[in-house]
Amino acid sequence: MQTLADLLNTIPAIDPAAMSRAQRHIDGLLKPVGSLGRLEALAIQLAGMPGLNGIPHVGKKAVLVMCADHGVWEEGVAISPKEVTAIQAENMTRGTTGVCVLAAQAGANVYVIDVGIDTAEPIPGLINMRVARGSGNIASAPAMSRHQAEKLLLDVICYTRELAKNGVTLFGVGELGMANTTPAAAIVSTITGRAPEEVVGIGANLPTDKLANKIDVVRRAITLNQPNPQDGVDVLAKVGGFDLVGMAGVMLGAASCGLPVLLDGFLSYAAALAACQMSPAIKPYLIPSHLSAEKGARIALSHLGLEPYLNMEMRLGEGSGAALAMPIIEAACAIYNNMGELAASNIVLPGNTTSDLNS
């Protein structure tokens, strides 16, 4: 049986030769060089992913939503009742939540995965990977054991790889869990080295008079648990949550297949920071969908070296931003595969040389 270390070692490097070929191809299309901006860069990035075999394309699309409760909810860091996690997860099975509507619009399937919802019985219609009924309260204990974190990572990686075997070529990550912006902020603070007050935001409309308590909870969690910022698993286990671990697993699993994964908002940035500590090789496979309105978003993205494609002032989570950005990926593939070539039209533009076009 493969271990987590075994799977991390399978993550392939991006193919620079394929990216160079894609650059020459795109420069020879019916347009001035660089005139489609970041869409061109995205197509070239996709061409370098081994799982796409040098040709940017989209097969099946999937948004994986990791659902879990958090013991830190007891600290008064969220105004929504904890039961909302289970209620919204059930609503996802009916296709009525934000991510479900946006994913349907994008032609993507939504996989709702219970990795730690606090209910007595599993919720019908959810994929059951539950580790426990919620994580530990990070203000007074670790979120989980390292063994639990590693096992969940491995389970989600394997599940993601199985979806890839069944034709999924574009993944999106999402989450659901009351109070989960608190552990996310703790992860971002730990790995970036920024102070809690710089990264803690209001989450799901936390009143501003409760923000000081949330900042204090994050500070206490880091001080108590002493997560090692160089060890992504340690950070997730000590100050994270099962939903954050699950998202990191999707990223690692997609990258191990040489396939792209769309990030969502602040929670996914935190998971990505931890995943990149485990394997920096995954970074070229991460595509930032949108700029979360949550405080600390820019800090996390800057540390990742990523610039989001959309700025919609969204902070819903669920994978809503990932679903919304899927047509951008398809657009990048479309220009690469369907545009005509300058050479075939006898057009010569500055910056488009004959040697470029015929290489």
Curated annotation (Swiss-Prot):
InterPro entries: Nict_dMeBzImd_PRibTrfase, Nict_dMeBzImd_PRibTrfase_bact, Nict_dMeBzImd_PRibTrfase_N, Nict_dMeBzImd_PRibTrfase_sf
Its EC number(s): 2.4.2.21
UniProt-annotated catalytic positions: 318 (proton acceptor)
UniProtKB keywords: Cobalamin biosynthesis, Glycosyltransferase, Transferase
Top class in the EC scheme: transferase
Record field: catalytic activity: 5,6-dimethylbenzimidazole + nicotinate beta-D-ribonucleotide = alpha-ribazole 5'-phosphate + nicotinate + H(+)
Pathway: Nucleoside biosynthesis; alpha-ribazole biosynthesis; alpha-ribazole from 5,6-dimethylbenzimidazole: step 1/2
One GO MF term: nicotinate-nucleotide-dimethylbenzimidazole phosphoribosyltransferase activity
A Gene Ontology biological process term: cobalamin biosynthetic process
NCBIfam families registered for this protein in UniProt: cobT_DBIPRT, PRK00105.1
Family note: Belongs to the CobT family.
HAMAP family reported in the protein's UniProt record: CobT (MF_00230)
Record function comment: Catalyzes the synthesis of alpha-ribazole-5'-phosphate from nicotinate mononucleotide (NAMN) and 5,6-dimethylbenzimidazole (DMB).
Self-association state and partner proteins as the record states: Homodimer.
Protein name as catalogued: Nicotinate-nucleotide--dimethylbenzimidazole phosphoribosyltransferase
Organism: Escherichia coli O139:H28 (strain E24377A / ETEC)
Organism classification: Bacteria, Pseudomonadati, Pseudomonadota, Gammaproteobacteria, Enterobacterales
Gene designation per UniProt: cobT
